[in-house]
Amino acid sequence: MTIIDPDLNNHFINSLIKKHQEGGIYPMWDLASNYTGTMIGYHAVPVIVDAYMKGYRNFDAKEAYKACLRAAEYDTTGIKCPDLVLPHLMPKAKYYKNAIGYIPCDRENESVAKALEYAYDDWCISIFAEAMSDFESKAKYERFAKAYEFYFDKSIRFMRGLDSKGEWRTPFNPRASTHRSDDYCEGTAWQWTWFVPHDVE
């Protein structure tokens, strides 16, 4: 949107910020202005960071930045949503990411997909942190942005689930997909292995 309609994009961003102020966190796949917790990642972050870095800043950058940091941390306090939605809006995957550095596949469904999306979103936060002169957070989120490396099994050249003991998920079939019950979200290792847009080398 920053290319085709930056003014409309600023309206989107102001709506995202308002949603955070009213509900306690950025939305994930909002439906009829309600939290659903559907899908993964915290992709309000790249929308905001993209606009900010391109100079489209008709929004409260400090409030947006604070909300970006909030989106990346595991903290269920202050979120106004139905109890049924909360575990999806604030999945334990964020806790594992921050506490042990990776998301165990035997503790969280779609662990690889969540980790790869979180890594990209965290990279975006690191860029925003630098722009906001928050160098401590910049270093922290740069480190989180490299978390995708945990999942790359060099022996087979695929992103693959790691269990809570740090061992690869077996058996492994890069073409296998069991909707909502495996290490990937609506895809396979063949598709998800390539999702590292912030570090294509």
Give the role of each language-model region.
Residues M1-A129, E142, W192-V200:
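Aromatic-rich carbohydrate-recognition surfaces in CAZymes
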Residues P27, S126, A131-E201:
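Catalytic cores of carbohydrate-active enzymes
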